């Protein structure tokens, strides 16, 4: 079973609130999850300490078992001071390079 650390949306219309959850990769975004390991409230100011709240010990455990974070959650984990496995860092770098290449191709087409 592939396990991901990802965001599950909650809150009201136009007022998002996300739970950081450990879930089976095949499960729906807001469906069943194995464990809740934090919250993310994008409505709060970026310098607010309650904007991103993570259970660091549980995230370290799940990363150790092979769970892969999504890009957004990986950024939160790095900001919290936790280290990501090298494999995850490499995947993030490759995705960033591909994104830059796509955007530069699109800019060249438009020009």
Curated annotation (Swiss-Prot):
Any one Pfam family match given in the protein's UniProt record, by short name: Ribosomal_S16
One CC-aspect GO term: small ribosomal subunit
InterPro entries, sorted: Ribosomal_bS16, Ribosomal_bS16_CS, Ribosomal_bS16_dom_sf
Annotated TM spans: none
Region (Disordered): 92-111
Keywords, sorted A to Z: Ribonucleoprotein, Ribosomal protein
GO molecular function: structural constituent of ribosome
Disulfide bridges in this chain: none
One annotated GO biological process: translation
Family statement: Belongs to the bacterial ribosomal protein bS16 family.
Protein name: Small ribosomal subunit protein bS16
Organism classification: Bacteria, Pseudomonadati, Pseudomonadota, Alphaproteobacteria, Rickettsiales
């Amino acid at each position: 079973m592939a396990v991901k650390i990802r965001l599950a949306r909650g809150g009201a219309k136009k007022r998002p609130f996300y739970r950081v959850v450990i879930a089976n990769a095949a499960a729906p975004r807001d469906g069943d999850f194995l464990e809740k390991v934090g919250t993310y409230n994008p409505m709060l100011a970026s310098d607010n300490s309650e904007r991103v709240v993570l259970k660091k010990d549980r995230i370290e455990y799940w990363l150790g078992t092979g769970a892969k974070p999504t890009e957004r959650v990986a950024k939160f984990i790095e900001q919290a001071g936790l280290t990501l496995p090298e494999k995850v860092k490499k995947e993030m770098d490759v995705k960033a390079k591909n994104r830059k290449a796509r955007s530069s191709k699109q800019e060249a087409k438009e020009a």
